[in-house]
Amino acid sequence: MYKLLKKDGSSRRGEFSTPHGVVQTPVFMNVGTLAAIKGAVSTEDLKEIGCQIELSNTYHLSLRPGDEVIRKLGGLHKFMNWDRPILTDSGGFQVFSLSGMRKIKEEGVYFNSHIDGRKIFMGPEESMRIQSNLASTVAMAFDECVENPAPKEYVEDSVKRTTRWLKRCKIEIDRLNSMPHTINNKQMLFGINQGGVHDDIRMEHAKIISDMDLDGYAIGGLAVGETHEEMYRVLEKVVPNLPENKPIYLMGVGTPANILEAVERGVDFFDCVMPSRNGRHSHVFTSYGVIHLLNAKYELDDNPIDSECSCPTCKNYTRAYIRHLFKAKEMLAMRLCVIHNLYFYNNLMKEIRESIDKGNFLQYKKEKLEKWNETV
């Protein structure tokens, strides 16, 4: 259940109550695709750096270790030792990214495993059953993610199919939640708005799925080929057509600057692999933009990554030391940078929430973007 606490322009400050705890929004979901953050970051680390909610992937976990294995071990929370909310992606984005290996039918999608090439089928019911086995807090509806740009006629047909699939997802999750052996019989369902960069399709689809009274609504099919300006325009068209009393999630986005722009347009939830992926490659976010620790100028730099940061990495280690670890190919280098980047993102969201509470979000956003000098 979502409670809107404060609005500052279109930006929203809220609370999302779940069976696994309350999430303060706007929020960044830390991405643990295979039930772990890449970079040797533990769930204890995540709590220390302020992570409220974690995201894992249905498709990948269904292949390895298998959703039945996780079900038999008590569900994803118990499996990964995490007692806070978890959102599971439906697997749709991963399936549709296998463009040369899949066939879309009304019943679902036929594709080949990226691991061993075996043939797999996934449709709305299969996705819901896998997510029920995982026992995540929030299950995402199975949808088709169309890369931008795409022919309008195809996008229209795809959105209609996604709507039919959403109805099937809702029927199936209601059935699964009513069954006695279901681990989490209060699993929530978020629907996904699609429509590419076509405003009319997006707005009509938002109105249709809003009538289905879901637990939350995501905006998908962005950050897949369109410009930032197109993304922001789509948000301005879609968000006002979604229910104000439900959380709004922008999938797979993005940079800190993207997040600020989307919060200004009313978005509550975000996820992106960028902080962990960039950290593993020695790129770290700071109060003054992104720096690359492998640059020679950091060889004798005994400052922390960011003097304004309070993360465990910045409290204890220098740029020179972390650069040495990368040069020596020590795993600790990746761990320290991923922890720092995730702290940066989670702390950014905390500051955003505080700025909305104070009614000065736009001023906060302006100062941040100027300070980052558009490098974030």
Curated annotation (Swiss-Prot):
The active site is at 89 (proton acceptor), 271 (nucleophile). Binds 1 zinc ion per subunit. Pfam families: TGT (PF01702). It comes from the Bacteria. Its cofactor is Zn(2+). One of its GO terms (molecular function) is metal ion binding. Transmembrane segments: none annotated. The keyword Ribosomal protein does not apply. Residues 252-258 are annotated as: RNA binding. It catalyses: 7-aminomethyl-7-carbaguanine + guanosine(34) in tRNA = 7-aminomethyl-7-carbaguanosine(34) in tRNA + guanine. Pathway: tRNA modification; tRNA-queuosine biosynthesis. GO terms for biological process: queuosine biosynthetic process; tRNA wobble guanine modification; tRNA-guanine transglycosylation. Catalyzes the base-exchange of a guanine (G) residue with the queuine precursor 7-aminomethyl-7-deazaguanine (PreQ1) at position 34 (anticodon wobble position) in tRNAs with GU(N) anticodons (tRNA-Asp, -Asn, -His and -Tyr). Catalysis occurs through a double-displacement mechanism. The nucleophile active site attacks the C1' of nucleotide 34 to detach the guanine base from the RNA, forming a covalent enzyme-RNA intermediate. The proton acceptor active site deprotonates the incoming PreQ1, allowing a nucleophilic attack on the C1' of the ribose to form the product. Homodimer. Within each dimer, one monomer is responsible for RNA recognition and catalysis, while the other monomer binds to the replacement base PreQ1. Belongs to the queuine tRNA-ribosyltransferase family. This is Queuine tRNA-ribosyltransferase. It comes from Clostridium kluyveri (strain ATCC 8527 / DSM 555 / NBRC 12016 / NCIMB 10680 / K1).
